[in-house]
């Protein structure tokens, strides 16, 4: 009888987790994250997207001063996300591809031989959250895990509004309303989870788990489908 392969899982790591401004802290984080991803990736097919964070915003800001177009600014952002993917992939070593796949199609091909597969951005106009969602839809993934620098989705930004409350569970309509409220679509903006990601996962009926990626024990739980602290976004597929 054929052995059933566990369903793939897709992780989107926010750039703010990868570049804090403190090289010693970032080195330790990359190393510990790579260890966790290697372990989970051996148990099931795992795809990871890496964000560009503050570094991407710095390059996009510089490009904007130089009068670059929005598409050119997005392309700068993509280069930074790919740099972060390369760092993580190189730490993991073969068979994880050292050169991050540049499209969803390339991810599918790479995953036939390696897990985890790490990539950055692909096309101008969205973020690595959107890439993670597109990959998940193509792979019929069990879930997307979004690792960020807050421990879930709040009613308002908890860094500025101490009274904001964390949602344990949201449906897609609620998350869509929050994303639309907080974004206008320019290059380098900071989204809770990007619009393309919300639309793609809602259509595909794939749940989203939002967790604090600084807590690698909790991140491991979210990746393995165990109980985790954070926000679960679910809803009926349309
Ligand atoms: P990020 O995915 O890092 O976006 O891509 P972000 O919203 O800044 O997320 P955090 O802060 O890392 O969590 C950085 C920028 O690169 C461009 C966009 O301009 C994005 O804002 N980008 C990225 C693309 O145009 N396409 C992609 O597929 C990925």
Say what each PLM segment does.
Residues 1-238:
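C-terminal catalytic "cap/lid" subdomain
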């Amino acid at each position: 009888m054929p052995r059933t392969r566990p369903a793939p899982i897709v992780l989107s790591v926010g750039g703010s987790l990868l570049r804090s401004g403190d090289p010693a802290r970032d080195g330790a984080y990359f190393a510990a994250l790579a260890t966790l991803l290697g372990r989970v990736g051996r148990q099931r097919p795992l795809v990871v997207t890496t964000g560009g964070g503050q570094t991407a915003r710095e390059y996009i800001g510089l490009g904007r001063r130089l009068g670059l177009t929005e598409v050119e600014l997005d392309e700068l952002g993509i280069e930074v996300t790919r740099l972060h993917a390369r760092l993580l992939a190189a730490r993991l070593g073969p068979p994880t591809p050292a050169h991050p796949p540049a499209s969803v199609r390339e991810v599918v091909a790479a995953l036939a031989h390696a897990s985890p597969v790490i990539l950055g951005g692909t096309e101008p106009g969205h973020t690595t959250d959107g890439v993670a969602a597109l990959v998940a839809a193509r792979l019929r993934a069990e879930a997307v895990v979004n690792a960020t620098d807050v421990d879930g989705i709040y009613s308002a930004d908890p860094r500025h509004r101490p009274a904001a409350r964390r949602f344990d569970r949201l449906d897609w309509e609620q998350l869509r309303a929050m994303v639309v409220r907080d974004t206008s679509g320019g290059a380098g903006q900071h989204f809770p989870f990007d619009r393309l990601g919300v639309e793609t996962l809602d259509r595909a009926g794939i749940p989203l788990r939002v967790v604090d990626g600084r807590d690698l024990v909790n991140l491991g739980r979210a990746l393995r489908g165990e109980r985790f602290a954070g926000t679960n976004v679910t809803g009926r597929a349309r």
